[in-house]
Amino acid sequence: MSSALANIYARLPVSFTHGRGVWLWDTGERRYLDALAGIGVSCLGHGHPGLVAAISEQAARLIHTSNIYEVPQQAALARRLAELSGMSEVLFSNSGSEANEAAIKLARYYGYKQGNTHAHIITMDSSWHGRTLATLAATGSDKARQGFGPMPSGFIQVPYNDLPAIRAAGEAEPRVTAVLLEVLQGEGGIRPSDMAFLRGVRQLCTERGWLLMIDEVQSGIGRTGKWFAHQWADIRPDVMTLAKGLAGGVPIGAMLAAGPAAGVFAPGSHGTTFGGGPLACAAGLAVIDAIEQEGLLANAHEVGAHLHAALASELAGVPGIIEVRGHGLMLGIELDRPCGILATRAMEAGLLINVTRERVVRLLPPLILSGEEADQIVRILVPLIKQFLAQQQ
């Protein structure tokens, strides 16, 4: 491809021209089963009629004005998200990083209003919250931060799924104002949190007057079989961030606030040029409509359970397999060794996946995936994994 592009991606040697459903076609008209969905973005697959119509109609009418004016599509999407989540207010942006940046700013401003001029946020090891400096500082990855110091201060990282560690961190640092975590770590290797842990963190935050901030950028919008993954624990955060699947491929992010976090920001506290524009919000409304009308929450739960069970059965007892894990259509297969080459081999076999944390095969197929298509994933992927492990003995 063009040498004018910045060299920041290790791209696979394929270009796609069009897609339909869970399928993509390359420049040579070869078909691929897309089990990655643009890293969890294309939740309705490709070429979804309702989404295409909403984008086309809105683009023909109006693409952009400004947040200095009323934006009806933005207000409508905010209402829908508030209804689905039980949250009170929504701030739109353009990406997950921006949504998490807004959450970090809100937590600090929340502390500032209480007289805490150096608010601290507790985050988790192996977490991922974005590539801006503040979200990198919050992210539990030394590798991602390497070379970009000095990092913003005010972040305390503790082991994931470890409630006593969070409690101890708060006792050691009296300036803590918030806890930021993922219900299901994506870049961290598809690591689910314990439901008891989530409920315990919710209770601890309430007791200590901290904000519970949940990053649902990858796990939200139906991916686990509920609108938001934290709903499996029957809790409500004070702050939630969304992006990826929210508009089915059109760039968007959102930060939702409730309880003590609602009303913290005022005019001038934060802002965005493009966030919550008419086009992105029209797409977001179409995504929510499609998920509701097509029963995609149930589909993600049921087909995801089928895919999980099939992979676990086929890989049971295979030397080198650590675990098949995840929830809904957010699944990971952990191997005992680095396996990045599997993304290339799967692509060569007509299946799109990726590998995170060096040794976890990640699957994030569209929510429209059928049982038959899930079986196709298994038929392609399992032999590739077995062959790879046998060659590495």
UniProtKB/Swiss-Prot annotation:
InterPro entries the record matches = AcOrn/SuccOrn_fam, Aminotrans_3, Aminotrans_3_PPA_site, Class-III_PLP-dep_AT, PyrdxlP-dep_Trfase, PyrdxlP-dep_Trfase_major, PyrdxlP-dep_Trfase_small
| Gene3D superfamilies named among the record's database cross-references | Aspartate Aminotransferase, domain 1 (3.90.1150.10), Type I PLP-dependent aspartate aminotransferase-like (Major domain) (3.40.640.10)
Q: What class of enzyme is it?
A: transferase
Know the name of this protein? Acetylornithine aminotransferase 1
Q: Where is it predominantly found?
A: cytoplasm
Molecular functions per Gene Ontology: identical protein binding; N2-acetyl-L-ornithine:2-oxoglutarate 5-aminotransferase activity; pyridoxal phosphate binding
The cofactor remark states:
Binds 1 pyridoxal phosphate per subunit.
The compartments listed are: Cytoplasm
Family annotation (PANTHER family): ACETYLORNITHINE AMINOTRANSFERASE, MITOCHONDRIAL, AMINOTRANSFERASE CLASS III
Chain positions found as N6-(pyridoxal phosphate)lysine: 244
Pathway assignment reads: Amino-acid biosynthesis; L-arginine biosynthesis; N(2)-acetyl-L-ornithine from L-glutamate: step 4/4
Note from the entry: May also have succinyldiaminopimelate aminotransferase activity, thus carrying out the corresponding step in lysine biosynthesis.
Instruction: Please give the organism.
Output: Bordetella parapertussis (strain 12822 / ATCC BAA-587 / NCTC 13253)
Annotated pyridoxal 5'-phosphate binding lies at 215-218, 273
Cellular component terms (Gene Ontology): cytoplasm
Required co-factors: pyridoxal 5'-phosphate
Name of encoding gene: argD1
Q: Which reaction does it catalyse?
A: N(2)-acetyl-L-ornithine + 2-oxoglutarate = N-acetyl-L-glutamate 5-semialdehyde + L-glutamate
Q: How does it assemble?
A: Homodimer.
